[in-house]
């Protein structure tokens, strides 16, 4: 059923991981123990839309587990405390060396192997492990209640040991919401602002999901680019950092304002079969209309009903100035498709870190959510392989690489500094100054 199960790793490689998990089932095991075995095996598929989820009862009880009271950042393979919710509240900025006697390198390796992500892209997995670090310590390693943590001071390099008492996850979420509202995920689709006497337009796109009742995404984009035209901006900075995707068509529509000739966005959408046999385990049965499908010679099917298929037209008013795009490992799915097309058409300069989605497309679209009958562990299985239209030569298992790599420090995060944005602003100002001189 999975649309691209062997897209990045061979059958032998994936089978080996599932065989290892099966071999470990040589004794009685509870649902959480089974989840710990299954999750790395599923992650070996290397698909960012494919994952094992906790049973619903364990997921609900997780809110009351006593977990490590830190928010962390993974930076170049090292783990730093970003927010400290422990009793002393004085450890932010420290580097974690070990937890309960386990070296942090081993912890990160174990958690990363269990994290879903496209291909061989480390930036996305680093972000996802960092976001869910405290939860993963429990669900994958069983660490809870009491934590013996060894820390390194980044400046003095001295080591200190701390006995940290776990706190309920629910309380930690509430503390984060109250103390650090700036850390919370934004639900905005788009925000437009201007700098340098309106010579620089800044388009912040947090996701491709429109929640406004009185406007659709197409209208919002059109009005935004009309405003950019009316203010005669010379440089456009587009920020899709931590944009995990949304509506496919909005990514294509955004790209259509950056180009002035017809273009192809998707080459093909394919599925393995027109009939699925796992309905008894699925939350909702999958039913694809026959008129949407066209049989292929290899036994698969082309999916025909999608607005991003076929020749696409540019949108007006097209922006013809310089484009700078801020990216990171959280730029995924719909935003990754947009980034591939911009990159393949040489339409922008990229700043930040490698994007989170594989260059030639992902496996997503229609999904099956399966619940395993004995453990109630759930599996998310995407059915559709997306093939982006591009002749650009690129590693299939990697994302878009930045022209200007920027690596943040833990102090950047704590102090709220944004070096990617500052660099983009500097480049935009330099570009505008050169234009004026000419």
For each feature predicted by the language model, list its residue ranges.
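Conserved acidic, small-residue-rich alpha-beta core segments centered on
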Residues: 94, 248-416
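Flexible, low-complexity junctional segments that flank or bridge functional domains
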Residues: 1-236, 240-271, 279-283, 359, ...
